Amino acid sequence: MMNKLSEEEIQDKLKKFDGWTYAKKSIHTSFQFENFKEAFTVMTRIAFEAEAQQHHPNWGNVFNELEISLSTHDADGVTEKDFKLARAIEDIVESTN
């Protein structure tokens, strides 16, 4: 099991993630895309990465908007696993621009 990060550790790590915030034991972000197809394409790519990492986001999609929250349920908070997936998500989104 991964160790839960302290709020100080989380805030420090978030400095490297533009647009991500910490609240309610999770890190959160949102993205806006050109259209639904682009949003869904990114979601599909994230889904494959999440499966590969065996770590899955809590997310929602309405048309061209995607909201993502990451936490590690076993740790009841945020761990390194969340930041690893967040980095992969950032890379996926960046590669679509």
UniProtKB/Swiss-Prot annotation:
It holds the Pfam family Pterin_4a. Belongs to the pterin-4-alpha-carbinolamine dehydratase family. GO terms for molecular function: 4-alpha-hydroxytetrahydrobiopterin dehydratase activity. This is Putative pterin-4-alpha-carbinolamine dehydratase. Keywords: Lyase. It catalyses: (4aS,6R)-4a-hydroxy-L-erythro-5,6,7,8-tetrahydrobiopterin = (6R)-L-erythro-6,7-dihydrobiopterin + H2O. Its EC number is 4.2.1.96. InterPro entries: PCD_sf, Pterin_deHydtase. Gene3D superfamilies: Transcriptional coactivator/pterin dehydratase (3.30.1360.20). It is an enzyme of class 4 (lyase).
